[in-house]
Amino acid sequence: MTTFAANIELLYTEHEKFEDRIAAAATDGFKFVEMWMSSLQDVHSLAAAAKANGIQFSSVLAEPRFSFTMPGVDLNVFFDGLKSSIENAKILGSPRLVLGSGMGFPGKKRPAQLDTLAEVFTDAAKIAEEAGIELVLEPVNTRHDHPGALLDRTE
């Protein structure tokens, strides 16, 4: 059976508070919601709203959004953010975090960039696994709304 999650960043925007968006999703029959930026929200309040409405978080975006292959990038910023995202996911009861690839760097060949990404994501997966959180990758549509993103296909 197919299961859908309402993205409360994009849906129910007539409600300013995300707690109200969770309630609206439940009213419409959703059992799951997802969101992007948990760091911008009171995750304890969202967790309480989800519980009160019989809703589960299916996923949350790993923060910060990051471009891993740019020259001089400080990967510690990503790993610190990942650890905070893991804590937020646990509070929300989300079993997974979504990793984006960030922007590609035009001055570096794609295979080398993918190698860098594989190394970073391997380290990230170890951290997440120790915390009991699953990481999933999201290839995005570079032709429509994510031009320049490194991961734009599933192969």
Segments (PLM) and residue ranges:
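N-terminal pre-domain/capping segments
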Residues: M1-I91, T122
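Active-site acidic/histidine proton-transfer and metal-coordination neighborhood
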Residues: P71-E155
